Amino acid sequence: MGLETEKADVQLFMDDDAYSRHSGVDYADPEKFGGSGPDRDPHRLNSHLQLGFEDVVAEPVSTHSFDKVWICSHALFEISKYVVYKFLTVFLAIPLAFAAGILFATLSCLHIWIIMPFVKTCLMVLPSVQTVWKTVTDVVIAPLCASVGRSFSSVSLQLSHD
């Protein structure tokens, strides 16, 4: 009735190391799935999504369900995750890829033809604006602040209790 004898029955659904009990997220090994085709996530953008059954459902040592219940629930978890993902990608992948393509094309066009020319124009104009601003600051704002400071420096307050 041990867990080791039941592992052979569910070998179809799970890997051998799926039974290891650990307390952290176990990211998938890229070499493990190397023979299954081209790498669809070469920059590991979604490595955080590779969660196993033990990362979602965990039983403490003091309370364990029956081995068959644990194995069946593990198998159903993996199968439902696989089937629902495939089902959703059939209906959502193409429209969302189309929408993402339109969004990124629009953002790229805006960045290339509007934002970058505006930024470059601002960077070209800023040295002259900086010179004018420094002159205005030195001629108007600095003397004004100095005179206001001198005026307030002669103010003194005396409090008396009556």
From Swiss-Prot:
Keywords: Cell membrane, Cytoplasm, Golgi apparatus, Membrane, Nucleus, Phosphoprotein
PTM section of the record: Phosphorylated on serine and tyrosine residues. CAV1 promotes phosphorylation on Ser-23 which then targets the complex to the plasma membrane, lipid rafts and caveolae. Phosphorylation on Ser-36 appears to modulate mitosis in endothelial cells. Phosphorylation on both Tyr-19 and Tyr-27 is required for insulin-induced 'Ser-727' phosphorylation of STAT3 and its activation. Phosphorylation on Tyr-19 is required for insulin-induced phosphorylation of MAPK1 and DNA binding of STAT3. Tyrosine phosphorylation is induced by both EGF and insulin (By. similarity).
A GO BP annotation: positive regulation of MAPK cascade
Bilayer topology: Peripheral membrane protein
Subcellular location: Nucleus; Cytoplasm; Golgi apparatus membrane; Cell membrane
Signal peptide bounds: none
Family statement drawn from the similarity comment of this UniProt entry: Belongs to the caveolin family.
Function: May act as a scaffolding protein within caveolar membranes. Interacts directly with G-protein alpha subunits and can functionally regulate their activity. Acts as an accessory protein in conjunction with CAV1 in targeting to lipid rafts and driving caveolae formation. The Ser-36 phosphorylated form has a role in modulating mitosis in endothelial cells. Positive regulator of cellular mitogenesis of the MAPK signaling pathway. Required for the insulin-stimulated nuclear translocation and activation of MAPK1 and STAT3, and the subsequent regulation of cell cycle progression.
Protein's name according to its UniProt entry: Caveolin-2
Organism expressing this protein natively: Loxodonta africana
Lineage: Eukaryota, Metazoa, Chordata, Craniata, Vertebrata
